[in-house]
Each structure stands twice: as structure tokens, then as C-alpha cells.
Amino acid sequence: MDTAMQLKTSIGLITCRMNTQNNQIETILVQKRYSLAFSEFIHCHYSINANQGHLIKMFNNMTINERLLVKTLDFDRMWYHIWIETPVYELYHKKYQKFRKNWLLPDNGKKLISLINQAKGSGTLLWEIPKGKPKEDESDLTCAIREFEEETGITREYYQILPEFKKSMSYFDGKTEYKHIYFLAMLCKSLEEPNMNLSLQYENRIAEISKISWQNMEAVRFISKRQSFNLEPMIGPAFNFIKNYLRYKH
């Protein structure tokens, strides 16, 4: 039996500003358009031979609308809920054939629907620090800068990297270890307008992002209590670092 642990690394940029209207530090967060559980299911990142509890947990972590979508057994609709019109034909056919083999051929989806019906509650769409997977031979910092621009539209000249700050965290889910690495940046004054509406400006920037906004520490705590991923362990130290940075800067 294969018991090897799989490592998935994501690298991000915690970008902060000082809101001059309320004198509070804020950071940019993005909200995913779909849950991690839904993405893992569509991309077949699970074992059909795993115990049913593991699969039910996956469905528990989907939103209600996502579970309803899976119950249609229409893989095209599931796939384009994530990819929209992105041309990924080879990957699509590979994942569709696996979905068909796992769920459609044995009993025309009856087991899948039965498992979904056992799910309770519902997952939420995560608010996250902008991050993503590094490309081959790409440095950690280069990846963080690239992913931040892709998800927010804000280019490199508008912020300053604070190189003394670099934090990482890891967590495990089954046989997968997820490692997140974060750098820290301070926004330049030219983009510090408190009423700058990032949601309207960049919401269509990338297919996987549905919303983007500035959040202070109180909001970060509120968001963290309502979702499975806690943002405080990374953003809290980043805000403290920014406070000290601004104190010594002035």
C-alpha cells in the first residue's frame, strides 16, 4: 500500500497598508469562487477505496450549491464551475474518465448521491491571503509577487517588500501536507486611499477569485471564526511587524 506523504506548497504575499481614516493596519484578502473540497473532488484528488468517512468529510466541506451540482452527475457543469472557459482539454478528459470510472460505470452515480446525502452542514468559500503554486525553477519571492499580481491586479511598483519577514505554516489532510510560505509587503502611498474599491476593480481578474477587499484585524478574526482556515497565525505577526516597522520608520 502506498503510504507516501504528498507535499503541496503555496507561496503568498501579505500586503498591508495604513488606513489613514481610522489609523488601522489593513491587508488584502481574496475570496475563492469555489471550495477547496469541490476542487479536490473535481480533480479526483481522493481515493475511491478510502473509507466512506473521508469522502463524506469532503462533501461536508463543500457548499450546499456545490453538493447540488455534484448530485447532477453532469461533469461538464462541475468542471466549468471551476475552469469557466479556460481551454484545458487534455486535463478535462483525464479527469472526466476517472470520474466516469469511479462513479458512473459501477452504478450510474447511486453511491455518489448516497454519500452526498449523508453530508451535514456546509462549507464556506474561503477568504485567503493571495497565494499560489510556484512554477518550475521559480524562487519563492518571485512566485509570491507573480501570484499577488494575478489575483489582485496590483503590480510590483506599488508596494515595498519587507525582506526581514518570512513565515511558513503546514497542516495535514490525510496523506497530503499543505505548506504555505508568506512574505510581507507595505503598500506605497499612491494606492492608500481608504475607499479604494478593489472588489469592483479586480473581481474579474482571475477565474478562481470572486471577491477581494481590505480587512483589518477585527475583520480577520471574524472571518477566521466562520471558516475552516484560520488567518490569524500569519496575519497577526505580520501586523505586529508592520507596527514596529512604522514606529522605527518615523
From Swiss-Prot:
Domain Nudix hydrolase residues, every copy: 97-239
Keywords: Early protein, Eukaryotic host gene expression shutoff by virus, Host endoplasmic reticulum, Host gene expression shutoff by virus, Host-virus interaction, Hydrolase, Late protein, Magnesium, Manganese, Metal-binding, Multifunctional enzyme, RNA-binding
Record: active site: 147 (nucleophile)
pH dependence per the UniProt record: Optimum pH is 9.5.
Effect of residue 147 to Q: Complete loss of mRNA-decapping activity
Gene Ontology annotations for the cellular component aspect, listed alphabetically: host cell rough endoplasmic reticulum
Catalytic activity: diphospho-myo-inositol polyphosphate + H2O = myo-inositol polyphosphate + phosphate
Recorded superkingdom: Viruses
Essential cofactor(s): Mg(2+); Mn(2+)
Record: residues binding Mg(2+): 138, 151, 173
Record's keyword annotation contains Magnesium: yes
Chief site of localization: host cell
EC number: 3.1.3.-, 3.6.1.52
Enzyme class: hydrolase
GO BP field: AMP biosynthetic process; ATP biosynthetic process; symbiont-mediated suppression of host gene expression
Pfam families: NUDIX
GO MF annotations in UniProt: bis(5'-nucleosyl)-tetraphosphatase (asymmetrical) activity; diphosphoinositol-polyphosphate diphosphatase activity; metal ion binding; RNA binding
Function: Decapping enzyme required for the removal of the 5'-end m7GpppN cap tethered to viral and host mRNAs to allow their decay in cells. May therefore accelerate viral and cellular mRNA turnover to eliminate competing host mRNAs and allow stage-specific synthesis of viral proteins. Acceleration of the turnover of cellular transcripts may even promote the shutoff of host protein synthesis. In addition to the mRNA cap, g5R also efficiently hydrolyzes diphosphoinositol polyphosphates.
Family membership noted in the UniProt record: Belongs to the Nudix hydrolase family. DIPP subfamily.
Subunit structure: Interacts with host RPL23A.
Protein name: mRNA-decapping protein g5R
